Design a protein with these regions (language model features):
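Membrane-proximal intracellular helices of multi-pass ion channels
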Residues: 1-170
Length: 170
């Protein structure tokens, strides 16, 4: 699953339940989310972030200038990725909070983790820790929008790309 998560392939070797058995396991969820995010944000963004981070560490530039020195593409990719993860997490969390077939049986922290995992993986890799068929209709629609947007240019995810959507709203 780690290779599939990093490549955003969505290949699931666990059968028809995907990662549902690990819905409340923070180590598996966080590790998988990090792999998905890092590969979906794009390798050009990685290079830009690492190059500017190196300059901050070596004190070539002040730390407060770090984000402002990123290329426009990198800024849009980072901001849109964060915005989509947060908005998806909040939407799924509240829409599915009382649904006994998805988040309803979990404690609030587990619900937040599962909602965040769903938000991250829907845009790119396609894994699931909650039943996709049991989602409320509004959650399915929001997930379809996230799928349509996908990841960032230069990454391994599909979709119309985060920067394209950002440019539509600017």
């Amino acid at each position: 699953h780690s290779v599939s998560a990093f490549c955003n392939a969505g290949i699931d070797i666990l059968g028809d339940h995907s990662l549902c058995d690990y819905a409340v396991n923070p180590i598996i969820n966080i590790t998988t989310m990090l792999l998905i995010i890092l590969s979906g944000i794009g390798f050009t963004v990685w290079f830009d972030v690492l190059e500017n981070g190196r300059k901050v560490i070596s004190r070539e530039v002040p730390r407060r200038w770090w984000f402002t020195r990123l290329r426009l593409h990198s800024k849009l990719a980072v901001i849109m990725t964060a915005l989509l993860i947060v908005s998806g997490t909040v939407f799924i969390f509240f829409a599915e909070y009382h649904n006994p077939q998805t988040l309803g049986g979990m404690d609030p922290g587990q619900k937040l983790l599962a909602a965040m995992f769903q938000s991250v993986t829907t845009r790119t890799a396609g894994f699931a820790t909650i039943s996709q068929g049991a989602l409320h209709e509004e959650s399915k629609l929001f997930c379809a929008i996230l799928m349509f947007i996908g990841g960032s240019p230069g990454g391994t995810a599909g979709g119309v790309k985060t920067t394209t959507v950002a440019m539509l709203f600017l």
